[in-house]
Amino acid sequence: MSNSQWVPVSLNEYLAHLPMSDEQRAELASCTTFAELHERLSAQPVTDPAEAAQASVGRRLTLSADDLEDAEMLGVDASGRLCLKATPPIRRTKVVPEPWRTNILVRGWRRLTGKSNPPKPDHSDLPRDLPKSRWRTVGSIRRYILLILMLGQTIVAGSYMKGILPYQGWSLVSLDEITRQTFVQTALQVLPYALQTSILLLFGILFCWVSAGFWTALMGFLELLTGRDKYRISGASAGNEPIEAGARTALVMPICNEDVPRVFAGLRATFESVAATGNLDRFDFFVLSDTNETDIAVAEQQAWLDVCRETKGFGSIFYRRRRRRVKRKSGNLDDFCRRWGGEYRYMVVLDADSVMSGECLTSLVRLMEATPDAGIIQTAPRASGMDTLYARMQQFATRVYGPLFTAGLHFWQLGESHYWGHNAIIRMKPFIEHCALAPLPGKGAFAGAILSHDFVEAALMRRAGWGVWIAYDLPGSYEELPPNLLDELKRDRRWCHGNLMNFRLFLVKGMHPVHRAVFLTGVMSYLSAPLWFFFLVLSTALLAVNTLMEPTYFLEPRQLYPLWPQWHPERAVALFSTTIVLLFLPKLLSVILIWAKGAKGFGGKFKVTVSMLLEMLFSVLLAPVRMLFHTRFVLAAFLGWAATWNSPQRDDDSTPWLEAVKRHGPQTLLGACWALLVFWLNPSFLWWLAPIVVSLMLSIPVSVISSRTNLGLKARDEKFFLIPEEFEPPQELVSTDQYTHENRWHALKQGFIRAVVDPRQNALACALATSRHRQAQPIEVVRMERVDHALKVGPAKLDNQHRLMLLSDPVALGRLHERVWSEGHEEWLAAWRASIEADPHAPLLPLQPVVKAPEPVLV
C-alpha cells in the first residue's frame, strides 16, 4: 500500500501548498502527524508538539523565499524563536515632549509667584560660525508691506460697503427715545442697524482674507515670471556635489489602513529612482504601519517581502507595525525617532500616496548640507495619477494655480514658512530635541493628541532658531488627491478639527509671529466658511427687514425733510467687480504664465484656457457646498461631535446616488427654501443670490457626475484638464502606475485567514509578529484562551481585536495554525479554501520550487 493511500488528506493538502519538489513532497508524505511534519521540516527535535509549527517557520519561509537566507534576514529573538530582521537594531534616543502652557494668565501668575516657566529655547545646537541671515530682515519688511496692503485694501472696500448699505450710521437711533419705549419697539428700531453693523464686520474679515490670497498669488506670479528670486532655497546648491557618507537619510512612510498595492508601488518607484542616482547607500526606507485591520496588515507584510525581493532591498527597506497606536501619526514618527532617529542626519516624510524622484531627494540632502541653519525644507508636491472628473479638475487646479500661491508664500515667509507634513526633508537632531509633541492639556474636543502636527512642528523648529523653507521650484515631488467631493470633505473634517486645535497654541510663549499667523490662517481656512454663511444669512435678514418693516422717514418732532434709506448701485457694482477680480485674477495670471512659459504640456493655449474657464465654473458650483460642510465641521468641533464618517468602499471611486442624496439632500432642500424665501421678499434680489442657491440645489448631480471615471478619462482624451505629468509622465509616475497594476493583480485578499491557515503565509506572519514575550504562566494562559476562542467561534465571528492580538503573537498564531490542521477545523479550512478559489491569480497546485536561471558565464 502506498503512502498516499493512508496519509490524511489534510496532510497532502498542506504539502501541496509548500513550494518543493515532488521528491521532497513524497518523502514528507510518510509523516503520520503534523507535529512530525513540522519536526522534519525544521530538521531539529521538537519537545512540545504544540510548538511544532513554530519550529518550522524558518524552513517554510525559505522554501517560499530562499533569498532571505542569502540576505541574512533570518534571526532569533530572546526566546530562541525565529524572526525576520524587518527593522534595524534599536538604538534609542531620548525624545521628551515639552508640556504646553497655553494659558497666558497661568503663565503670568507663575511669573509673579516666582515659579519656573519653561526655559527659553536653547540655540546651542545651531552652527556658531553662521552670520546673521539677511533674509530675516527682508522677510519682516515684506510682511509689513503685506499687512499694509491687506488692511488698506480692506479699509477702502469697507468704506464702499458702508456706503452701499441703506442705513447710514447709528445717529438716527435716539438713546432718550429708547429709554421711554418698550423692549420690542427698541429691538425693532435697533435691528436694522445691528444687522448692518454685523454685515459690515463680517465683510471686513472676509475681504481681508481674500486680499491676503490675492497678494500672495500676485507676488508668486511676479516671482515665477521674472525668475529672479535671490532668496530661493534651491539656489543654495549647485546640484552635483557628492553626498558625504555621514549624511544618511531615512525615508519614512507612516501608513494606516491604506491601499496596500498603491503604497508599495510608490515606495518601489521611489526606491528605484534613488538607486538610479547611485546614492542608494545614503538612504534607508521605513514603512511605519499603524494599521489595525488584520487583513490589510497581512497584505502589508506580504507586500513588504515582495518589494524587498523584487528590488533586492533587504537591509534598505524596513517595515514595522505598531501594536500600541499612541498619538496617531505624530506618535508613529516619535517612535521612529526614539528607536532609530539618532542613526540618521536627515528624515524625509512621505505620505501613503507620495512618490519622489531620486534627483529630488538627493537635491534635498544637498540643500540641507549647503544650508546648515535649515531645519525643514518643504517641496511643493504636484498632484497626479487620478482619473475621476473631480480629481482631474482638482489636480489641474493645483498644478496651474498652485505654483503661484506656493511661490507667493515663499516670497512673504522666506525661511519662516509652512511644513505640510510630507514630501519634506527634516534635520533629525533639532527635530528630536525640539519638535516632540505633548498632548494639549485639558478636556474636551480641543484637548489631547495634536491632530495637525505639521504646522506645530514647523513652529517649534522655528522657535528653536532653525529655518523652515519651501523649495517651490524643485521638481520630482508628487502626491495624489481624493477622487471625489465626499472623500475630500472627509479629509477636510480631520484637517478642520486639527487646525482649530492648533489655535490653542497661538499665544504659547516663544512662537514666532509668522507661525502665529500660520495658526490663524489655518483656522481661517475653515472658519471663513461659517463667517460667509452668516454673512449671507444676515444679508437675507436685512432684506427681510427692509421688505417687511414699515420704514420710518420722520424720526424727530417738527422734522421738515424725510430721511430716506440710501442706495448706491454704482458702488455695489464697483465693489462686486473688485471682489471678482481678487478671486479670479490669480487664475487668469496662472494661465498667462503658462502661455509665456509654454502651454504644450497642458494641451495647448486654447485647451488650457477652456479648462480654466470650466474649472472656474465648477469651483463656483462647489463653493457653497463646501461652505455648508465646513460650517458643519466647525460647529461639530466646537460641540464635540464625533469626527468619524465611514464612506462605503468603492472600487471605481465614484459616488453612488443614494449616498449623494444622504450627504447633499439637506443642502438641496436649504437651497430651494432659501430661493423661495428671497423670491417672496424681493424677486430682484434673487439674481444676486442665484450662484449660492442654484449651486446648493445642484449639489447632488454635480457630486455624482463629477465622481465618474469615464468622464475624467474622456476629458483627458480631449486634452482638457491636462497636466504635464500626463503629457510627458516622469519615469517615477510611469513605474508607480505599472507596479500598482501588477500589485493589484496578485493582491492578497482575506489576509488574516491566510495567515492562520496557509503554510507559507503563516510562516511570514509568525516571523514578523512583534509581541515576543518571555515564557510566563499568565501569558501562557492568555494565549491558550485566545487560541481556544478562535477555534470555537471560527473566522466569521472572530472580532478584529482578537485577530490583532493573535497576529501580533507568534506563539499563539503558530499554535492556532497547528491546531487548525491537526484537529481538522473545517470552518477555518473551508474559509481558507474559499479565499484561494476566489483569487483568480492563485498558483496551480502542487507548488514547485522556484528554479533560478543559471547566470551567464563571462568569457
Curated annotation (Swiss-Prot):
Membrane topology: Multi-pass membrane protein
Keywords: Cell inner membrane, Cell membrane, Glycosyltransferase, Membrane, Transferase, Transmembrane, Transmembrane helix
GO cellular component: plasma membrane
Compartmental location: Cell inner membrane
Pathway in which the depicted protein is active: Glycan metabolism; osmoregulated periplasmic glucan (OPG) biosynthesis
Tagged with keyword Transmembrane helix: yes
InterPro entries: Glucans_biosynth_gluTrFase_H, Glyco_trans_2-like, Glycosyltr_2/OpgH_subfam, Nucleotide-diphossugar_trans
E.C. number(s) listed in UniProt: 2.4.1.-
GO terms for biological process, alphabetical: glucan biosynthetic process
GO molecular function, one term: hexosyltransferase activity
Family according to the record: Belongs to the glycosyltransferase 2 family. OpgH subfamily.
Protein name: Glucans biosynthesis glucosyltransferase H
Organism listed in the record: Pseudomonas syringae pv. tomato (strain ATCC BAA-871 / DC3000)
